[in-house]
Amino acid sequence: MKTLGQFIVEKQAEYPNAKGELSGILSSLRLVAKIIHRDINKAGLTNNIIGNSGVENVQGETQMKLDLFAHNTMKQALITREEVAGFASEEEENFVAFDTERGRNAKYVILTDPLDGSSNIDVNVAVGTIFSIYRRVSPIGTPVTLEDFLQPGHKQVAAGYIVYGSSTMLVYTTGNGVNGFTYDPSLGVFCLSHENIQIPPNGKIYSINEGQYLKFPMGVKKYIKYCQEKDKSTDRPYTSRYIGSLVSDFHRNMLKGGIYIYPSATTYPKGKLRLLYEGNPMAFLAEQAGGIASDGKDRILDIQPKELHERVPLFVGSREMVRKAEEFMREFSEE
């Protein structure tokens, strides 16, 4: 069985001029995954990471204790190892420049949602960590700037997630396909378990919070009805599956075929998910696995972000299902 460490070394060897910086970042993320995995598995035995922290994040959302733990774990691991020039998190208002000699000379910045779906942890539902890595655009040797983080998603050099479920998996891409590694706690290593993952071009699963139906755009309402209608030629009706954790829903749909939708709504007209921390990394993974991702109209990876915590509607998953949803969005446009 090939380990994540072996896989990283093999891939680095394919690029003779590579100096190992990206490999070092992935190694840091591997450590973060192990630490968060350890504490999540003890969540029911301690009050230290369960429940609300009483603190609000920059979006005005109440942070769970585990949000803060995951955020601080990720941040500290990156600071200690000095593998990146800067760090931005969904849980922190501003980016952090690692203003040390090694940090200023690092080539990459990382953006992260340290713990997606954290409200589920109290009831033992799978949660995840999402990450996105870019090559900085500011001069090497200087502190990073906001422009290093405000890059369109097609400029990502790597992205992935860690899902903490019945097993812990690290799934990532560096632009050459998607591979998944399952954690073996008895050995303390991630082993290659899902090589060259491909999203089926079509599927039978649609994932959306139907409790918000009345607030959705007409195109989304019509697509939901389409999914529910009986039609032998397209093997409908489809199955509704919604966990409430982007990582978990995306992971299932990537393996089985399906579409995940978090649209705009009357209560959040620009969408609710964050472009830089959730939309871009999931879109990069989807495209690398043969799927697509859009905001209902345009390709997610082509959007030029204007601010660090910008929100976006997200339609992501099997190619044919996303295209069909886009058809409904165009046909029933409310502009």
Swiss-Prot record:
Cofactor needs: Mg(2+)
UniProt-annotated binding residues for Mg(2+) 2: 113, 116, 278
Gene Ontology MF annotations: fructose 1,6-bisphosphate 1-phosphatase activity; magnesium ion binding
HAMAP family in UniProt: FBPase_class1
PANTHER family: FRUCTOSE-1,6-BISPHOSPHATASE-RELATED (PTHR11556), SEDOHEPTULOSE-1,7-BISPHOSPHATASE, CHLOROPLASTIC (PTHR11556:SF35)
NCBIfam families per record: PRK09293.1-1
Protein name: Fructose-1,6-bisphosphatase class 1
